[in-house]
Amino acid sequence: MQGIVIKNTGSWYVVRLDDGRLFQCKVKGNFRLKGIRSTNPVAVGDIVRIVPTEANAGQVGMITEILDRRNYIIRKASNLSKQSHIIAANVDQAALMVTLRHPETSTTFIDRFLAGAEAYRVPVIIIFNKVDLLDEEDRHLLELFFRLYEGIGYPCYGVSALNDGAGLCSVDTLRKVLQGKTTLFSGNSGVGKSTLLNALIPGLDVKTAEISDSHDTGMHTTTFSEMFDLPVQDGELPGHIIDTPGIKGFGTFDMEREEVGHYFREIFQTSKECRFGNCTHTHEPGCAVLAALEEHRIAQSRYTSYLSMLEDKDEDKYRGKI
């Protein structure tokens, strides 16, 4: 029997079979994937084979095999720097939700996520939520963000999940961007992922929570990853969203120091003009990246993010300005 993992609840996984039936499954024995030291060998989005558990009359089974993944997104497991946590598998794109205020998403968090997605060949769109809360100065900052990230190839959308008419694009317009694809939703806690999900999928009623008044940071409402189906209109292909717990930090995993620049699109492209093939873009003579930085062809915030990853620093220590 074959199906797709649509929910992870820790030790149990919900698997939807090709015929639509749902099975509560566990992983067989010490099941592990070759080459990956992971806290969770099975992820939402995985295509798996299962066998029903004979001892149970209900729809309970055991996962015996994970079929080859098209891709996956991975990050360091919290407090376990040598292990990884697979966020989702077999996705067509990732949607990174960010907010400029309430709470503020740091540019280094954004860039670390983008670099991680680049490493695993997952396209990313950036969704700026709560744009209705921005004052004139912040709206100018939003324009700079759009110019920066769209300029290097990441589509950007400005929405207001709670006040749809106040967004730069409507929730329905965004839904059409997501239709026909499996999209990973990710972002810091408190950016409004659950609220936007409720707007995209009427009747879903995912739990939401307020922002912490004392720290202006989000409080987790999503505990485990889960896949939701987008409503389908005439002629549309089905779309799916994988909702993930809010991430406070995004530590990259298994990225060699000399590879970091490969996952910053503009740095990688510019580095082809560097005098030395092993240039780190920090001090070398004839470095095209440093020249581009000096000429403002590469944003200071992106370079700061690059340095933080090069030095393997925590992104919370970096608050880059565009």
Task: Pin down the residues of each PLM region.
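Conserved beta-strand/loop subsegment of P-loop NTPase cores
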Residues: 90-98, 121-131, 152-159
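Hydrophobic "anchor" residues on beta-strands that sit immediately upstream
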Residues: 61, 95, 125, 184, ...
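Helix-rich effector regions associated with P-loop NTPase G domains
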Residues: 11, 37-55, 67-87, 123-124, ...
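Conserved ATPase-coupling elements of RecA-like P-loop NTPase cores
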Residues: 106-107, 135-142, 251-255
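C-terminal effector/interaction modules appended to NTPase cores
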Residues: 1-118
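Arginine/glycine-rich "motif VI" loop of SF2 helicases in the C-terminal RecA-like domain
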Residues: 115-123, 147-151, 269
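Canonical P-loop GTPase G-domain recognition
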Residues: 133-191
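Walker A/P-loop
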Residues: 189, 194-195, 199
